[in-house]
UniProtKB/Swiss-Prot annotation:
Gene Ontology process terms (BP): prolyl-tRNA aminoacylation
InterPro entries membership: aa-tRNA-synt_IIb, aa-tRNA-synth_II, aa-tRNA-synth_II/BPL/LPL, Anticodon-bd, Anticodon-bd_dom_sf, Pro-tRNA-ligase_IIa, Pro-tRNA-ligase_IIa_arc-type, Pro-tRNA_ligase_II_C
The protein, known as: Proline--tRNA ligase
Organism this protein belongs to: Thermoplasma volcanium (strain ATCC 51530 / DSM 4299 / JCM 9571 / NBRC 15438 / GSS1)
UniProt-annotated location(s): Cytoplasm
Written domain comment of the UniProt record: Consists of three domains: the N-terminal catalytic domain, the anticodon-binding domain and the C-terminal extension.
Record EC number: 6.1.1.15
UniProt keyword terms in alphabetical order: Aminoacyl-tRNA synthetase, ATP-binding, Cytoplasm, Ligase, Nucleotide-binding, Protein biosynthesis
Length: 462
């Protein structure tokens, strides 16, 4: 396997392949095949997202993949932001369609005509829905598994509210939801408000959740958008107020994609392979029997016990592989915890525990497994989080001059917010403005022009 520090790009590509996450050999560029193991991980990530949003009164929906040109063109600024990325369906069978249909690049234009039918009065608000679907964008840049592709596994939440203040409260709620998701995935991040020229098409403002890969490049892993009434006026989404007058709703959205998996691979993995947070590991505990009389039955009994307390456990009883090969194989797949059992453990009624990311082994009594295994999985998660934060912090650099921008990572510097100063930084350092950092409200002089500025983040991005 490639060395992660020396050649991150090749290491990443290799680990995606050998861990059976995805196969990029499908004969359409940027449309990769999810392998079973990768899809299981992604579905577990989806479940974390569902659990996080469901507790905040969101309902899941599923909209059609096709959007008519007319529906898209209702909001001109929105389609202008995507027009070069849209896949168009122009024929049905052999017949040319009267109106072209788009494969959804995102779902505002699909959902909001329906919102205008669903929302009638203040009693229908807030409206809070989400879906997890494929979206399609004609990506012309270099594609990379889970990072930049043409068919994207996508979560999108859409809301409608009575007032701007209620929509702002929803924006705050998104940050609470996101923090819960990021904690489960052990992902460090910064909140950045995107510059005006980089906000989502049609939004009043956009806040992004940015992390940094070991290569030093930033990776956007989530966004939230305040729409105000920009979309509701165009799609005629209004409600009857208690005083008998009509008002346009205020809207927000929240989006994430399989980039979450890309971040997990890149940030947590090592030269042995994946390191998976327990919450998203398809197999949380693998039991490797060392051949001996009665050992396999002992292993199966342990599997039954752990499955019974909600641990995803699997006995590797493959006959044609040695225990050593199995250890390496499951380490490569990122399984958080390994249990080794042989004749000695059977005789002593013990097991040997080996965590994926913690050195050494631990012998515990069989009867204490139901306590020891959950505790060990908690320790695995804590160590993943600790290591990720350590790497993240090492790649966040405070700059006092443009010379400091030569360093890799997320560069923190004061900036006035002007496009002119941003362009100068990008032209001289190849690092663009991600936006103002919302984790810190410090102020200072712009690193370029010397005018009053706020703390901003700059980086080369994926």
């Amino acid at each position: 396997m490639e060395n992660k520090k020396e050649n991150f790009s090749e290491w990443y590509n290799e680990i995606v392949t050998i861990s059976d996450l995805s196969d990029k050999r499908y004969p359409i560029k940027g449309m990769n095949v999810w392998r079973p193991y990768g899809w299981k991980i992604m579905k577990l990530i989806d479940n974390i997202i569902r659990n996080a949003v469901d507790k905040h009164s969101f309902d899941e929906v599923n909209f059609p993949v096709l959007i008519s040109r007319g529906m898209l063109e209702v909001e001109f600024e929105h389609i202008r932001g995507f027009e070069n990325e849209i896949y168009w369906v122009t024929k049905g069978g052999k017949e040319k369609l009267e109106e072209e249909l788009a494969l959804r690049p995102t779902s505002e234009s699909a959902m909001y005509p329906m919102f205008s039918l669903w929302v009638r009065s203040h009693a229908d608000l807030p409206l809070k829905i989400y879906q997890i679907v494929s979206v399609y964008r004609y990506e012309t840049k270099h594609t990379r598994s889970f990072i930049r592709i043409r068919e994207i596994h996508f979560f999108e939440a859409h809301t409608a509210h009575e007032s701007y203040e209620d929509a702002e409260k929803q924006m705050d709620e998104y940050r609470i939801i996101w923090t819960e998701i990021a904690d489960a995935l052990c992902l460090p991040f910064l909140y950045d408000q995107r510059p005006e020229w980089d906000k989502f098409p049609g939004a009043m403002y956009t806040i992004a959740f940015d992390t940094v890969m070991p290569s030093g490049r930033s990776l956007q892993i989530g966004t939230i958008h305040q729409y105000g009434t920009n979309f509701s006026k165009n799609y005629d989404i209004k409600y009857l107020k208690e005083d008998g007058t009509f008002e346009y709703v205020h809207q927000t959205t929240f989006g994430m994609s399989e980039r979450l998996l890309a971040a997990i691979i890149g940030i947590h993995g090592d030269d042995k392979g994946l390191i998976l947070p327990p919450a998203i590991a398809p197999i949380q505990v693998v039991i490797v029997p060392i051949p001996g009389e009665g050992v396999e039955r002992y292993a199966k009994d342990i599997e039954t016990t752990l499955n019974g307390i909600g641990i995803r456990c699997h006995v590797d009883n493959r006959d044609n592989y040695t225990p050593g090969y199995k250890y390496n194989d499951w380490e490569m797949r990122g399984v958080p915890l390994r249990i080794e059992v042989g004749e000695r453990e059977l005789k002593e009624k013990t097991v040997t525990l080996a965590a994926r990311n913690i050195r050494g082994k631990k012998t515990v009594q069989r009867e204490k497994l139901v306590y020891e295994v959950p505790d060990m999985l908690d320790l695995v998660k804590e160590k993943i989080t600790e290591d990720a934060k350590k790497t993240f912090n090492s790649l966040v650099v405070s700059a006092s001059s443009l010379d400091d921008f030569k360093k890799e990572g997320l560069i923190k510097a004061f900036w006035c917010g002007s496009k002119e100063c941003s362009d100068k930084i990008e032209n001289e350092t190849e690092k663009s403005a991600l936006g103002f950092n919302l984790n810190n409200d410090e102020t200072g002089k712009c690193i370029v022009c010397g005018k009053a500025g706020k703390l901003a983040i700059f980086s080369r991005s994926y």
